[in-house]
Amino acid sequence: MAESLAEIYNKRVLLFDNDKQGNISRLFDLYNGDIVPGACVALKSRVLVPGTIQKTAIPGVDLVNSNYFMELAENEIRADQESPQHDRYKAALAAVAGEYDYCIVDNPPDLGINVINAIVATDEVIIPVNLDGYSLDGLEELAAQVKNIRALNPKVRIAGCLVTDFEKSDYAEAAEIWLRTKSGLHVYSQHIRHYKKAKDATIAKKTITKFCIRSGAAQDYKKFMAEYMKGGK
């Protein structure tokens, strides 16, 4: 999304890696496991100090990186029962909001303090969904949690579900029909097809659209962004 927003729609984008695995940070070769990352600084101190926002190789896209120090930061926040725990990213991002058109937060699947902070700070949530039983079960739980967090952030909404890694089969098609008709959530028309060389793209440290622009998945992502932007974003 960040790449398309910057290159096609000329938007200024802040990418926020909120996953301790740091996959987005690794993609842009900005992962450093030896220092406290920008996401950790924001979670602990409620600010993005100079140096915590880094330039990526994509003009118009900056990054707040992450690593396994995030786990230590979360434990520290949990232990602090005197200070508010859920408004930390909101305060940090508010200070730089004028510099960007979009902030995209990449979250892990678990709903820890860092993810709650991200939802409190955001306007909308896009849920990527694989069409398997575990993902669909987790989807219902996540949707319920987002609704609960509205007590802390009344503006937040689930913008929609994006079907990813799609491989055609009777079971997958049945699951997609259920998702679109029975889940009660908006599902984007465009789904993202499975790309067998996706792992190769991560090794090359390139986005799928840069690694193989002609692949079905790359074209699907561009079509999804067009659909998303038509929604008035």
Show where each model-derived region lies.
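P-loop NTP-binding core
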Residues: 1-233
